[in-house]
From Swiss-Prot:
Xref: Gene3D superfamilies: 1.20.1270.10, 3.30.420.40, Actin, Chain A, domain 4 (3.90.640.10), Substrate Binding Domain Of DNAk, Chain A, domain 1 (2.60.34.10)
Major localization listed first in the record, in broad terms: plastid
Its job: Acts as a chaperone.
Family: Belongs to the heat shock protein 70 family.
Matches recorded under InterPro entries: ATPase_NBD, Chaperone_DnaK, Heat_shock_70_CS, HSP70_C_sf, HSP70_peptide-bd_sf, Hsp_70_fam
Species name: Cyanidium caldarium
Record-given protein name: Chaperone protein dnaK
Length: 618
């Protein structure tokens, strides 16, 4: 049976897991690490770098290194003002108002989906090697508070990476699956998920294999990146006070500050004070400047106090929506690396009057849960029923620019709802359906998921035509909308792919490009390996010549020496076919030498005197 992997596509790091022998297991990447940085870069020669190797070169290549891309996926340019200012690469707006990421070395704009697909591709290629079979099917997680277009965009990223994405599952729900797989007693759990770029709170009731989401709340503009940014801003201010130089204008310095801030934040989870040392951070006419600064936990908590306070609101909202008191919560599960921050753990404890459960790995639990969901879909795991909800209300714009809700937030999915609407003016022959997502009263204040037209309505006084609008949400939380005029039966339907996601043609084009690039990358890797083999053969052949110089025929010696010289020349000029031919020729010649030497040794052994020995028993 084909394996279905679970992928946690994170803002900072990503993880892939699979069900093996009835137990979920995290799959290490090709470098042997269990988490992979969600970082993609292009080198000056056009080579694609993904993961740890991309992260390591970010300081010297800030404009071509793309990180925290999850904060842009499925969003319009106008929605990312704050996030745009936090990255060192260029984020552009296309004619449709969508987000594009510019790569100077390639002189090309990429969509966030394309960049995310490279991370997914790295994970699945590593998993394919690890499992010994090609991975084509996956369950991918998203923050519970992701809207429809962000979910669709994540699914598109999976498609571009060559995957059949069987299910999009909410991260806190996945975490609850991992936590509650073997739980038999009924429990109400609160999943507090603070990742690199998003924050979710989900309350579930679990027991006897049923995982029912009672409510979800969150903030898709809050995560570990924001905590790093507070430290970076403080360092920039401190440096400006000391040297009157604004480091925020220097991309390379800003990248170094960001890395140092992340490192300091992580260290302050286990120590009370850390040192930030940045030699040669910049230079003046008087010479280079080194930056050294101490940061203690108290100062860090002061810097991020506003962010910590923001974490309380979704907790309160989730309890209110689930109609529960904090005393009703049996367990608190912490998810995401940012939950290691002591101030966050204290906030959770104070807000819910309970110590959080520390038995799950916050970095891996989401991918593990996604792998369990994959096993459920594959039929490997039975007796598990997952009842998730839509995180935000869905509706249409009606007369006066009002949002009329059709499916309230926290409705269990999949679900379907139909309402009858009519025309606003006499003899109206078409209607435009404007689909919205959000909790505000006015249409303009909510997220627009798209519009479509229903034509062919028979002319009639306003209010007479009956237009049946049906909202259908699937198990992925992705919406389809149908509008039908009841008299004529005229119908128009659309899967809301979100105004900022890609259409089918674009996806197919990007998939083809990704496949071509993947083939080119494989070819580059094969060529590098071929050159490495050739270097080894040159070294070994030369060693053999030096070692047996006196025993080798002079003509043969000269022939091999010439072949080695030609092979070295072919390596330096990248003549790959010639490299293969010369490698073969050298191997053939050195084998002949080996045979001749062995033959001579055998003759010498036969002709040598044989010494008889007498043995006596002792």
């Amino acid at each position: 049976m084909e394996k279905i992997v679970g992928i946690d596509l994170g803002t900072t790091n990503s993880v892939i897991a699979v069900m093996e022998m009835g137990k979920p297991a995290v799959i290490p990447n090709s470098e042997g690490f269990r988490t992979t940085p969600s970082v993609v870069a292009y080198a000056k020669n056009g080579d694609l770098l993904v993961g740890q190797i991309a992260k390591r070169q970010a300081v010297i290549n800030p404009s071509n290194t793309f990180y925290s891309v999850k904060r842009f996926i499925g969003r319009k340019f106008e929605e990312i003002n704050e996030e745009n200012r936090q990255v060192t690469y260029q984020v552009n707006k296309d004619p449709s108002g969508n987000v594009k990421i510019y790569c100077p070395f390639k002189n090309k704009d990429f969509t966030p989906e394309e960049i995310s697909a490279q991370v997914i591709r790295k994970l699945t290629e590593g998993a394919s090697k690890y499992l010994g079979e090609k991975i084509t099917k996956a369950v991918i997680t998203v923050p519970a508070y992701f809207n429809d277009s962000q979910r669709q965009a994540t699914k598109d990223a999976g498609k571009i990476a060559g995957l059949d994405v069987l299910r999009i599952i909410n991260e806190p729900t996945a975490a609850s699956l991992a936590y509650g797989l073997d739980k038999k007693n009924n429990e109400k759990i609160l999943v507090f998920d603070l990742g690199g770029g998003t924050f979710d709170v989900t309350i579930l009731e679990i027991g006897d294999g049923i995982f029912e989401v009672l409510s979800t709340s969150g903030d898709t503009h809050l995560g570990g990146d924001d905590f790093d940014k507070k430290i970076v801003d403080w360092l920039v201010d401190e440096f400006k006070k000391s040297y009157n130089i604004d480091l925020s204008k220097d991309k390379q310095a800003l990248q170094r500050l960001t890395e140092a801030a992340e490192k300091a934040k992580i260290e302050l989870s286990s120590v009370s004070q850390t040192e930030i040392n940045l030699p040669f951070i910049t230079a003046t006419s008087e010479g280079p400047i080194h930056f050294d600064k101490s940061l203690n936990r108290a100062k860090f908590e002061e810097l991020v106090s506003e962010l910590i306070a923001r974490c309380k609101i979704p907790v309160e909202n989730a309890l209110k929506d689930a109609k529960l008191n904090k005393s009703d919560i049996n367990e608190i599960v912490l998810v995401g690396g940012s939950t290691r921050i002591p101030a966050i753990q204290n906030l959770v404890k104070e807000s819910l009057q309970k110590d959080p459960n520390q038995t799950v790995n916050p970095d891996e639990v989401v991918a593990v849960g996604a792998a369990i969901q994959g096993a459920v879909l594959a039929g490997e795991v039975k007796d598990i029923l997952l009842l998730d909800v839509c995180p935000l209300s869905l509706g249409v714009e009606t007369l006066g620019g009002v949002m009329t809700k059709m499916i309230p937030k926290n409705t269990t999915i999949p679900t379907r709802k139909t309402e009858i609407y009519s025309t606003a003016v006499d003899n109206q022959t078409n209607v435009e359906i404007h689909v919205l997502q959000g909790e505000r009263e006015l249409a303009k204040d909510n997220k627009s998921l798209g519009t479509f037209r229903l034509d062919g309505i028979p002319p009639a006084p306003r209010g007479v035509p009956q237009i049946e609008v049906t909202f259908d949400i699937d198990a992925n939380g992705i919406l389809s909308v149908t509008a039908k005029e009841k008299t004529t039966g005229k119908q128009q339907s659309v899967t809301i792919t979100g105004a900022s996601t890609l259409d089918k043609d674009e996806i197919q084009k990007i998939i083809k490009e990704a496949e071509i690039n993947a083939q080119e990358d494989r070819k580059k890797k094969e060529n590098i390996e071929l050159k490495n083999q050739a270097e080894t053969i040159c070294y070994q052949a030369q060693k053999q010549l030096n070692e047996f110089k006196e025993k080798i025929d002079k003509n043969q010696y000269k022939r091999i020496e010439d072949l080695i010289a030609k092979l070295k020349q072919a390596i330096s000029s990248n003549e790959y076919e010639e490299i293969k031919n010369l490698m073969e020729a050298i191997q053939k010649e050195t084998m002949e030498i080996g045979k001749e030497l062995y033959s001579k040794d055998s003759k010498n052994t036969k002709n040598s005197d044989v010494i008889d020995a007498d043995f006596s028993e002792t």
